[in-house]
C-alpha cells in the first residue's frame, strides 16, 4: 500500500506542477496560454469572495493559482511528510474552488470531470496517508500463549 500511495503522490504532484507551470509560462504553448487567459477572465467574474466585494484581476488570479499548483505539486513530490500533507490539503481546497467555479459558470459535466477526478485522487491520497499513519501508531496485539498466562499470574 505504501508503494501505491507513493506512486499516486508522485503522479499527482508531477501533474499539478506541470499544470501550474503551464499557467505561469506563456512559452509552453501560445494557443493554450491565450485560452487560459480568456478562461481566467470568466473565473474572476465568479470568484467566491466576490460576495464580500473582492474580485481579483484575472492575470493575478491566474498567476496565483499557477504558483500554488506548482509549489504544492513540487512539495507533494519532494517535500517532507508534513509539507506533503499541507500541499495535499491546499490542492484539495484548490480543486474544490475549481469545481465551485465551474458550477457557478454552469459548465457541462464533461468540463467538470477533470477537476472531480483530481479531487477524488487527492482525497484518496489523503485518506491513504491517514490510514498509513494510524497503522504505525496502533500496535498489533500480542497473541496470548501459555507462557504469557503463566507470567501474568506471578
Curated annotation (Swiss-Prot):
Pfam family, one: DoxX_2
Ranges in coiled-coil conformation: none
Membrane topology note: Multi-pass membrane protein
Places the protein is found: Membrane
The keyword Transmembrane appears for this protein: yes
Presence of the UniProt keyword Protein biosynthesis in the record: no
Residues in the signal sequence: 1-22
Name of the featured protein: Transmembrane protein 35B
Protein species of origin: Homo sapiens
